[in-house]
Amino acid sequence: MKKSKLSRENYLIQATDILRKSLFKPKGYKVPKVELSISWATSGNRGKNSKTAGQCFSKASHQNGINQVIISPSYSGSTIEGTLRILDILAHELIHAVDDLKSGHGKAFKDCALAIGLKSPMRSTTASDELNEWLRKNIVDKLGKFPHGSVSLSGKKQTTRNIKVECYCCGFSFRTSRKNIDMMDEVSHCLACDDGVLQVA
């Protein structure tokens, strides 16, 4: 299956329309108008170890009185399984929009989550096998895989450590690589006081 040709936001908009009309409405739940984006949550960790998969903001927090739903960019849609995970996160956040975050993850949230096929625990729901099959048939087969690879803020791990060099006389210090230390004269004079000798601290 190919990646969707839609932008990430257009994919989320079309997926939300399908979820709204074909999953939530038949179960008696009305999903309001929402704005959707891929973004880091305002709470929780960011990047590779992020525990915040998505976030829904109340209507009161938006200038136009519309719920804002964000999905973390740390999730990848490059596989069908990854796309299904993004869609079940979207469904979770849409439940919050249904009652404008009034119930948190309480009874009203749980009733809706179980009705559409999400599984416990409620703070970190996942799709049941039945919901995954529904998402695949009704969204993934129509729109393709979600057009996004995961993003991590953790970056590359540092492979070299700079070593501290210090003047025993005046306390001037700096850090440099092992290579630079190996190139220093046996006795290197301090750059700050000219009297002291630099030593590896």
Features from the language model and the residues they span:
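Active-site recognition of the HExxH zinc-binding catalytic motif
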Residues: 84-101
